[in-house]
Amino acid sequence: MEEIQRYLQPDRSQQHNFLYPLIFQEYIYALAHDHGLNRNRSILLENPGYNNKLSFLIVKRLITRMYQQNHFLISTNDSNKNSFLGCNKSLYSQMISEGFAFIVEIPFSLRLISSLSSFEGKKIFKSHNLQSIHSTFPFLEDNFSHLNYVLDILIPYPVHLEILVQTLRYWVKDASSLHLLRFFLHEYWNLNSLITSKKPGYSFSKKNQRFFFFLYNSYVYECESTFVFLRNQSSHLRSTSFGALLERIYFYGKIERLVEVFAKDFQVTLWLFKDPFMHYVRYQGKSILASKGTFLLMNKWKFYLVNFWQCHFSLCFHTGRIHINQLSNHSRDFMGYLSSVRLNPSMVRSQMLENSFLINNAIKKFDTLVPIIPLIGSLAKANFCTVLGHPISKPVWSDLSDSDIIDRFGRICRNLFHYYSGSSKKKTLYRIKYILRLSCARTLARKHKSTVRTFLKRSGSELLEEFLTSEEQVLSLTFPRASSSLWGVYRSRIWYLDIFCINDLANYQ
């Protein structure tokens, strides 16, 4: 019981992290700007001249005026710009949020680096490989084929801003930082909607995404910390890879309210969740909880999670946001793939003396397919084809040079083949390749004011050799002996550890 209470106590080493003075340091905002340059998603990139405007004095005046009066309240007549120190008011709110996000990430980054260095000493994994989207699929491929049921969970988002502030109260000990964060969030709420709920999951407003994603991740970690604690306590077999994946999304947070619960009836509570084959994965505002247990056990987990979110976070969380599905009878949209566990039947003939037997053996296999209908819908939205999949020209690219047009189409095709290299069946990818190739030909023909047949006859079919996918090139170099018959290799799944994001088709440059 002492170990449980020690786990739930706030870390004493974090009690002297005074972050408020760092807000007034100019180099913090410069580092945040450089960090955004590296990640290519900083709000400050839209305002490259801010370095000449931002200074210690401006930040101090801005925070002072925030406390003195409601300078962030925007009238209905002028919802975009107001005169505030001669600049856009929204721009300065974004600057402070970028700087504050960079500051609060410092303790987490130091803790993550120390944990990764301890793992790297054992040469278990490379930390940058865990950043790849494909790093999750080998884990699912190795474990999900042995499981029976899965909980599909739609993670609730905090509807109250105070919940976001309280997730950081255990390690941010200076009251000034918490007060500034609380005040800034409530004032920013009047400017823009922090979270929009148009989609079934969650989505943040385009401004200040890094700041609010940090708050959201810290909130989600507090939700997950109890589950991870119960999972580790109920099983004596701790997987090293599981611990590595946990460090990837590690955020410090403790739950004091559960101390009394564990102290009173911890053994009974622990017995309900004792399952050594429990696996958890979070992605895109959703999470899945898979187990080898029975339907009754998964139903207990479902009601436990509902009660936990309702009691601890005061959220109105309904049971309809959690669905129990059997892996063998259910396919799910997971990170752009249609993943499922299907039975692969195999017939074995056994000969014993004069008698022979036919043994039907079914093996579970984790299957990943390319969702053709959503993918064609994305191509149609980007004006590469119709909703039925018929290729059309791209008029907005007809003013470019021939090499640029071919390069853009080829880059999209190669990226799609690269991301969907883990598909069990590549036939869908070759259909997408056909759509993009013919769309490219029609775009070039439109530019030269001729038909596709006439253009290809005049230019030669070698003009579209750009569509030799990167997967085919890599496989031909990796397996030179099998270059003549790579059909068996094409059917195998290949997961790459260099895919860090998924871009919209319309934004490919």
Swiss-Prot record:
GO molecular function terms noted in the UniProt entry: RNA binding
Is the keyword Plastid assigned to this protein?
yes
Indicate where this protein is primarily found: plastid
Instruction: Tell me the GO BP annotations in alphabetical order.
Output: mRNA processing; RNA splicing; tRNA processing
Q: Which domain of life is it from?
A: Eukaryota
Any Pfam family from its record, for instance, is MatK_N
Q: What GO CC annotations are associated with the protein?
A: chloroplast
Which compartment or compartments is the protein found in? Plastid, Chloroplast
Under InterPro entries, the record lists:
Domain_X (IPR024937), Maturase_MatK (IPR002866), Maturase_MatK_N (IPR024942)
> Which keywords are on file for this protein?
Chloroplast, mRNA processing, Plastid, RNA-binding, tRNA processing
Q: Which family does it belong to?
A: Belongs to the intron maturase 2 family. MatK subfamily.
Chain's role: Usually encoded in the trnK tRNA gene intron. Probably assists in splicing its own and other chloroplast group II introns.
Under which name does UniProt file this protein?
Maturase K
Species for this entry: Nicotiana alata (Winged tobacco)
